[in-house]
Amino acid sequence: MAGAERARRDRRNRAARGWALGLLVALLVQFGLGMYVNLFAHIPLNHPGHRAKNFFAGSYHNVTWAETSPHAPLILAFHAGLGLLLVLGSLWLAVLAIRGRRAGFVWAAVLGALFILGAGFNGASFLNYNEDANSFVMALLFAAAVLCYIIILALPRSAIRE
């Protein structure tokens, strides 16, 4: 591998490590917001999208309601908004990892993005159907995403052994 190509990949992998750390911190904040919503926020059952027959249409209405309605708890808006940012950030980290071409980074980043996406779908499903199982799965997927980003931070800085 040429020196310039190796330097480019190392830069991308350093950026991926930075993004992994940022996402890890954001996930911990998200967990705290989610626990507050779960324990203390009152989410009315008559909001737009609740019990929708079409999951995706209902989810769209739920998230729109959570982000824009004066009747939605403000903490829910923060939780949903940070969740959307986590999805975008995790997808960007996956792109950086793929471009950096380190197998461990790629696997952990792609799995982390899938776990965050799955947690988001379960959050939308919780607003749709108000089932505790969705909240439980969201917590499990959070833990799995945290593990993925810890793995990225734990991997050696360079794939090339000196």
Specify the residue positions occupied by each region the protein language model found:
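Polytopic transmembrane helical bundles with strong interfacial aromatic enrichment
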Residues: 2-162
